Regions:
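A binding-site-centric feature that preferentially detects glycan-recognition modules on secreted/surface proteins
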Residues: 1-99, 105-182
Length: 182
């Protein structure tokens, strides 16, 4: 199948679930320590946090954020039955002009919009496979924020190589700022 056909096929599988508006990277943002400071400040607000969500394991997402950056954030859901692949989801994100902000982007979204995320969903912050953390088993891991019906949150890692279902939501960050070098 051609790339164009795969892109068309991918766009038919996903639809906007919620537009989360614009988030702004805080003035005190430091990329090198973002995840450490975020978890120091918020760990008790999460039911669970994966131990591998660290600045060391996620040092270089495709889009390195800087203070003052503005990002439009939308969440897309799968609207077809069955499963989709990470490659299909990434192809869809490309059609949306997404930038990949990694665990850092997900943490800023949680700080600024967690109260607007529909419950009982898993919000995944995709990136190019080579930019993702690779665990001890050689598996690439995708950062995600889980929100359960009761309101509990988890900051977790999923498997890039897995089959995704309708509960796994795609976070789409669109850059409204001048790009920085990654």
């Amino acid at each position: 199948m051609s790339i164009e056909a795969e892109t068309v096929k991918s766009t038919e599988k996903f639809a906007l679930m919620v537009d989360l508006g614009i988030i702004t990277v805080p003035d005190d943002y430091d990329h090198a320590t973002r995840l450490t400071t975020f978890l120091e400040r918020n760990r008790k607000k999460f039911y669970d946090v994966h131990n591998d969500i660290t600045d060391k394991n996620f040092p270089s997402p495709s889009r390195i954020l800087k203070p003052g950056d503005k990002l439009c954030v939308r969440a897309f859901e799968q609207v077809v039955g069955g499963t989709t692949t990470s490659e299909e989801r990434m192809a869809f994100l490309e059609t949306q002009g997404a930038v990949y902000t990694g665990a850092q982007g997900a943490s800023i979204l949680w700080d600024q919009r967690h109260d607007q995320l529909p419950k009982n969903k898993w919000y995944c912050s995709f990136d190019k496979k080579e930019r993702l953390f690779k665990d001890a088993d050689g598996i690439h891991r995708v950062p995600r924020i889980d929100i359960y019906y009761g309101g509990d949150f988890c900051f977790y890692l999923d498997l890039f190589e897995r089959a995704w279902d309708v509960d796994s939501i795609i976070l789409c960050f669109s850059d409204l700022s001048e790009p920085s070098e990654a």
